């Protein structure tokens, strides 16, 4: 199939904006990423329904300033470099320094895989590209534990994020869906039966 693509089609594949959520999906399971983003498959379960309800509450609040921090919700980002688009749950802006910090809301609790951190770091990369300023950290807020976890965007995490982005781009451009690789994580996946 690749041999039949025109030069313009190849360029379009390389410049396709990858959804921020695809990075987290890929880190969790490449098959899940392909099912959602290539095949447009989706199935609700109680976990996805809880996550949707959480984001509806977060997204419904208006911007506000409190104790020197401006809280902007539902921030749309789209950057050609590194080629990502999506919606940030919350961006905190220090009113004195202008420093930005993305905050991602998650339904559950901290996970052993780095998917949440990779998705958050990608948000920081988007803000950097859009504003020209360094975004050195963000935070993950977990509903289940009601705990906020700071995340430093180290050189290692940035490299891991860019490597994941490249892998997602390759997967989505291939149009292929990997076979199932069953494990403990499949119990929580709404797409496990697909």
Q: Language-model segments: what does each one mean?
A:
Residues 20, 167-188:
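Immediate flanking context of iron-sulfur cluster ligation sites
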Residues 38-39, 192-194:
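Iron-sulfur (Fe-S) cluster-binding segments and ferredoxin-like electron-carrier domains
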Residues 80-86, 93-172, 193:
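Nucleic-acid nuclease catalytic cores
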Residues 70, 148-150, 183-188:
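A general structural signal for short secondary-structure boundary/capping elements
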Residues 1-102:
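Metal-dependent nuclease catalytic cores that hydrolyze phosphodiester bonds in DNA/RNA
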Residues 33, 190-193:
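Extracellular/secretory pathway and lumenal proteins
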Residues 17-21, 85, 117-121, 184-187:
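Non-catalytic, well-ordered alpha-helical scaffold segments
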